[in-house]
C-alpha cells in the first residue's frame, strides 16, 4: 500500500478538557501548533497522498485559529474533512464556519449525565456544553446533506450502563442527528495506566456485549440515527489483523511529525522534511518490527494490551515522551 486511505491529524495538543482516557494526553503537553505557512505545507503534503479523508482531532481543533483555512485547503484538494470536537466553545460564528468548511463533524459525549461525562472528561460543565454544541450543529446542518453530524461515546466500565439512556436522550434532543458511535475505551495514552485499566476499562462481559450484534440491534430501537458499536480492537494492530487488510490511518502530530503506529508513541519523520509516501513506507516497516509483533501478537486482553502499550511507548517515544509518561498522575 503506497499511501494511506485516511489520515488523522492531531492538529494541536491544546485542550480545555482533561479527559482521563485521552490517548494524546492533550492539555498535558505543549500544543506544538504550527503557524499558517507550515500548516499549509503539511496540508499540501497530505493532499499529495490523496487520502479519502483527513480527520482533524487533537486536543481541541477549534482552538487553532487557522483550522478553517486548513479544512478549506484540504477540500479544495479533493479531500473530505472530518472534525472531532468536545464542543466546549462554539459561538454562532464558529458553528457557521464548521457547517461551511467541514464534511463531517463529531461531538464527543461520554455519558447520559453531567456527573458521568464531566468526571471522565475532567471539567465541570463540559457535558452541558457538548450537548449544546451537538444541538446547535445538528440544527445548523439540517437540510444540508453534504455535512454529517454525529456523536462519539467512549465506553468505559462506569458509563456502560448509561448507553441505553444516552440513545434515548440524543434521539429526543437531536432528532436530525446522523449517527452515534459507541467505541470501547482503548488502553492507550492515559488509559494505559494500571489504575485506569483496573477501575475503568470495560469488563470482559461488557466487551462481549459490544461485540454482540443483538446488543447493537437493541440500542437501535431507541434512536433514529445510524448506530455503530465497536470494541476498537482494530487499532491494536496485531500482526494477523494487518495481514487481513486492517490497515490503519496515518497519524500526524501537530507539528507534522508522522507516527509509526497511530495509537502508540514514536515518530518516523516530518511532513515538513520528507514526502508523505516515504514516511508511510517507513511507518509500515515498524509494523513488522519483531519488537512490536512480539508484544502485540499475544495481547489478547485489555490488561495485556495496556502492558504492550506501556512498553511500546517507552521503547519508541522520545525523551520528552518518556518524561511525560513517568509524570502521569495516578488513577483514580
Residue ranges with predicted function:
Residues 8, 108, 316-319:
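Intrinsically disordered, low-complexity peptide-like regions
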Residues 7, 26, 54, 82, ...:
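Short, functionally important structural connectors and interaction interfaces within domains
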Residues 101-110, 115-247, 251-259, 263-274:
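Radical SAM enzyme [4Fe-4S]-AdoMet core and its adjacent flexible, acidic
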Residues 1-97, 101-103:
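Conserved alpha-helical substructure of the radical SAM core
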Residues 1, 257-332:
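Flexible mid-to-C-terminal extensions adjoining Fe-S/redox cofactors in radical SAM and related proteins
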